[in-house]
Amino acid sequence: MGGCVGTHHDSSGSLNENSDGTGVALGRNQPLKKDKPKWKSDYPMTDGQLRSKRDEFWDTAPAFEGRKEIWDALKAAAHAFESNDHELAQAIIDGASITLPHGALTECYDELGNRYQLPVYCLAPPINMIEEKSDSETLDIPEPPPNSGHECQLRLRLSTGKDLRLMVRSADTVYHMKRRLHAAEGVEPASQRWFFSGRPLTDKMRLEELKIPKDFVVQVIVSQPIPNPTPVEN
């Protein structure tokens, strides 16, 4: 998770102090380096799971300390960086007056001295990526027998800010619970990414196998369609 701590620094940035007087070595501002971080996930990750992990970070990071406009700039810079558009990434960083002591987006400071940290998974995919399941595989998930398992309520927290209790059955797969959520809230299954305790839940997992304690919350990241830009009138 990204973090933010209050500091004060000038353009030289050699040493600055937090409010408690503790020195923080920032180093001079450096241009963004082109080298992408190489990292390995704790588990083999699909492209969809990586997107969900990133969505979760960008949805929650601005809720902590730091300025939203800086988080927005960092998100845009991270996207440009991963797309190998280093000139655009550097222009975004410069335009937002963001300082990079080590030339990397993993540690940044705004002009007020606030610190921002981007996780490596927002900057590059892991070396152990695996292929996404095809739609045909999802369609192959068998329907559970009618009335199989026991009925229960599952607490969900949507990234839209809504909390709800969904009636499910213990024999349901994650995919079938997504369909239940679609019936209740109109959210397409393909737009849902489910997480429990930070772990992504794949479509074929069954609720009874997940052993989710009663009243624990399952996070659902809802992918929002990108709105069409509003035309600017002359």
UniProtKB/Swiss-Prot annotation:
Residue intervals of the Ubiquitin-like domain: 152-227
Disulfide bonds: none
Coiled-coil residue spans: none
Basic and acidic residues bias spans: 32-41
Alphabetized PROSITE patterns for the sequence: UBIQUITIN_2
Residue numbers spanned by region Disordered: 1-47
Gene3D superfamilies: Phosphatidylinositol 3-kinase Catalytic Subunit, Chain A, domain 1 (3.10.20.90), Ub domain-containing protein, DC-UbP/UBTD2, N-terminal domain (1.20.225.20)
Pfam families in UniProt: UBD (PF16455), ubiquitin (PF00240)
SUPFAM superfamilies, per the entry: Ubiquitin-like
Compositional bias segments (type: Polar residues): 12-21
Function: May be involved in the regulation of cellular senescence through a positive feedback loop with TP53.
The protein's name in its UniProt record: Ubiquitin domain-containing protein 1
Species for this entry: Xenopus laevis (African clawed frog)
Gene name, Swiss-Prot/TrEMBL: ubtd1
